[in-house]
């Protein structure tokens, strides 16, 4: 369609207008075809499409699309917060029982006011500045301490060592956009993916400094990423086993589950997958110990939870 320009919201006619995209750029291919470079509005997908396959979306349709996505995401965030509170109560009860068996007294059962929580600290490196801003807001909603940085996928391997050394997180997120190339070809080749090779390089850079899954939990990937290669490089969790799309907030929901699982408990991939927006086939990984610790005593001067961008 003529008149489509960077910043427009469009949908692909050949895919039944199933996903809305933002136009990043319009280029002319070697074959002389005017083609739009696209990024998903709510999924972490990079794609391209000829202009004649695109339909510009009116403002009211975009508003409705965004409203539906916000409503869906809020239901997952609400469930995560409810799970946090239930885990907190269970953890305090467990400590009451442990204290009783040792002949000590922590306080009245279920009291817990003297304790404070230390969930796992997150370093979120994102190849999409808009998604990073949305994720930082969501991290605040989920009470997760995070440092966030916009770093293009191609540059992440070069920035990660310095960021890891500076912020020493418990959990590292390496994400942005990905997707199978239009030619696809051999799905066991990194060349068939737009950014999987960049995520692999970033994972390896991180693992040279922090080789243990127990020391540093890594989530890596985006839509249709080369799941097996990411795990082999050292990711704890990765996308996408079934080469399907993942939601922009799926990495964050994985992180929340790990960050708020107590250190004496193991969190499994099966548990994590059911908490993601996209669900089965989107994400997988290996079991890992949680990162939540309780501290004592609480102090009005302690301020652990923050979401900041670099």
Language model features with spans:
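Short helix-loop-beta junction
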Residues: 136-147
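Proline-aspartate-enriched helix->loop->beta-strand connector
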Residues: 164-177, 235
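Catalytic cores of nucleophile-dependent amide-cleaving enzymes
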Residues: 199-246
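Short, well-ordered loop/turn sites that connect or cap secondary structure elements
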Residues: 2-5
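Intrinsically disordered, low-complexity, charged/polar segments
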Residues: 41-103
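Short aromatic-glycine-enriched beta-strand elements
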Residues: 21, 32-37
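C-terminal functional extensions of proteins
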Residues: 245-310
């Amino acid at each position: 369609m003529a008149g489509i320009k960077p910043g427009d919201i469009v949908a692909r006619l050949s895919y039944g207008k199933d996903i809305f995209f933002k136009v990043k750029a319009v280029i002319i291919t070697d074959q002389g075809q005017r083609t739009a470079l696209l990024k998903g509005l709510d999924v972490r997908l990079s794609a391209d499409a000829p202009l004649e396959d695109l339909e510009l979306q009116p403002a009211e349709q975009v508003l409705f699309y965004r409203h539906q996505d916000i409503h869906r995401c809020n239901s997952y965030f609400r469930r995560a917060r409810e799970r946090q509170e239930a885990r907190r109560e269970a953890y305090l009860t467990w400590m009451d029982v442990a204290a009783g068996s040792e002949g000590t007294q922590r306080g009245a059962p279920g009291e817990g006011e003297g304790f404070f929580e230390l969930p796992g600290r997150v370093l979120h490196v994102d190849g999409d500045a808009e998604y990073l801003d949305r994720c930082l807001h969501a991290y605040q909603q989920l009470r997760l301490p995070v440092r966030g940085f916009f770093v293009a996928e191609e540059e992440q391997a070069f920035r990660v060592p310095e960021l890891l050394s500076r912020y020493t997180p418990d959990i590292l997120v390496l994400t942005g956009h990905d997707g199978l190339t239009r030619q696809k070809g051999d799905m066991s080749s990194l060349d068939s993916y737009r950014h999987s090779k960049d995520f692999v390089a970033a994972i390896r850079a991180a693992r040279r400094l922090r080789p243990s899954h127990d020391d540093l939990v890594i989530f890596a990937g985006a839509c249709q990423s080369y799941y097996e290669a990411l795990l082999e490089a050292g990711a704890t969790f990765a996308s996408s086993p079934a080469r399907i799309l993942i939601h922009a907030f799926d990495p964050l929901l994985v992180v929340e589950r790990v960050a708020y699982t107590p250190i004496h408990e193991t969190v499994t991939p099966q548990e994590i997958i059911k908490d993601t927006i996209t669900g089965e086939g989107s994400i997988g990984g290996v079991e890992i110990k949680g990162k939540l610790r309780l501290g004592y005593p609480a102090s009005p001067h302690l301020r652990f939870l923050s979401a900041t961008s670099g």
